[in-house]
Amino acid sequence: MDFSSKSLELCKSHSNQTDQLLKISKQTYEKYDNSLSKLHLIIRELNKQLIILKETSTQFNDRYNTFINDFTSLSNQKQSLFTSIENKLEILKKKYLDKGLVFKNNNNNNNNNNNNNNNNNNNSNKSTEDDNNENNNNNDVNKNNNNNNNNNLNTLYDFIDIESLELIKNQFLSELSGLNEICDKSKQIYKSTNESNLEMENRFLEIQKQYNKQIEESNSLSDLLTQQNNLYKTIQNQLINVASQCDFITFYKPSPSPLSPSPSPSSSSSSSSPSPSSPQQQHDFNINNKKEQIQLLLTSSLENIQLMSKNVKDIENQFKESCSIYTLVYLLNEKLSFGNDFSENWETFERFNCIFEQRLAGANYFIGELYSLGKWYDLFDESYDNLLEEVKRRQKEYLRQKTIAEQFNEELKHNYNQEIQNRLKFYDSYGKYLPVSLFSTISDQPISFQVKQIIEESVIDYSFNPLNLKRSSPINQQQQQQQPPPNS
């Protein structure tokens, strides 16, 4: 095969390669462009889902923070309240009772009980001696119990029902422990959910970063495609030029030249190189020149083809990088599809919320009871101090009224004696001269009056006894106050 045929074969091969490379470049760039468009839509949709997820997570976090705030508030109140109650109880322990008040009150109760028992025995005509002995024994037992109770009552603290107080405290601590357990379980859900959300957010940011990088590089890729088109045109022009040169070599024939004398041997030997002086030599020179041009063109076209191949690889690599974003998108979408897990966590959290509200209501109720007890302990202490003042006031009032009564008794006695003297004087002066039938009561004694102390059971019904805290809790007192009074 001659030079022209080989060159044309190379031209054909180069042309096919350039066609294929340009086609691949255009197809790859089109795929790349479509990929970026799809990525734009996918990223926008992912952003919407992440916004919804973030809003839901915000609600979740708000509720969790409410849990923590409520629990922390109760814990702080517990510490201060328990300390306050302990301090108040210590004050009550140091507040010693006036034994005169306690023993006097119980002795009066014993006397009333004995009087009631005696009245019952007197009214029972059919009661036997054994019954009387049993009543006497009961009176002795009651008396001993009262004495024992009096011996146990030394301070105001002895009136406090510690068992009920400890029961309320333990119930409050139980509710608080339940709240703490719910907070711990909610914290685990809160932590795992936030970690998952943070991971998805970081993945989305990475996708956005890669996408923005592809957008920036898309301009260079467009320039690369333009370069491919220009290289394609250059190679085609070079191949056309090669084909033209090959046609020249194939079809070119030198024109006949006039006869010339043959060169002398001396002249031929003296020439060092052939010169294109003859037509044949000129023809050979042109042919060689064309061959050199063809080789240069083929070499240049091959270099351009290699450059096109390199550009194709760059375009394909860029497309592969864009496709790698789909792997990140797939992973994020798979993570977002954990909606079932999130729904289960949300349902679990809703159940925790219901339990938390119930326990919170119970804890608030018991802490309210403890606050009420603390307030009543203050009122008890204050009331006892006022009770001592009231006893002094009553004693003073009793002495005042006693003084008035004694003075009035003296005045009544004086008036009575004065009345007797007046009647005797009237009788001596006039009465003895009158017939008895006319004034039969003339010798009667005057009616006497005197003031005496009357001791009877109190008719005042106190619906609230501030000293009997064991039998009158703040709750019972409130219920009693809310009940309507009985019809008289």
From Swiss-Prot:
Taking the record's annotation, the residue ranges forming a coiled coil are none
Q: Which UniProt keywords apply?
A: Autophagy, Cytoplasm, Membrane
Protein topology in the membrane: Peripheral membrane protein
Its predominant location is cytoplasm
Tell me where in or outside the cell this protein is found.
Cytoplasm; Preautophagosomal structure membrane
Recorded hits in Pfam families, A to Z, give: ATG17_like
Where is there biased composition of kind Low complexity? 105-126, 134-150, 265-279
Cellular component, GO annotation: Atg1/ULK1 kinase complex; nucleus; phagophore assembly site; phagophore assembly site membrane
**What's a Gene Ontology MF term here?**
molecular adaptor activity
Show the InterPro entries listed in the entry. Answer: Atg17 (IPR007240), ATG17-like_dom (IPR045326)
Please give the superkingdom of this protein's source.
Eukaryota
UniProt GO BP: autophagosome assembly; mitophagy; pexophagy; piecemeal microautophagy of the nucleus
- For the region Disordered, give the residue spans: 103-150, 257-284
What is this protein's function per UniProt?
Answer: Autophagy-specific protein that functions in response to autophagy-inducing signals as a scaffold to recruit other ATG proteins to organize pre-autophagosomal structure (PAS) formation. Modulates the timing and magnitude of the autophagy response, such as the size of the sequestering vesicles. Plays particularly a role in pexophagy and nucleophagy.
Q: Which family does it belong to?
A: Belongs to the ATG17 family.
User: What's the protein name?
Assistant: Probable autophagy-related protein 17
Source organism lineage?
A: Eukaryota, Amoebozoa, Evosea, Eumycetozoa, Dictyostelia
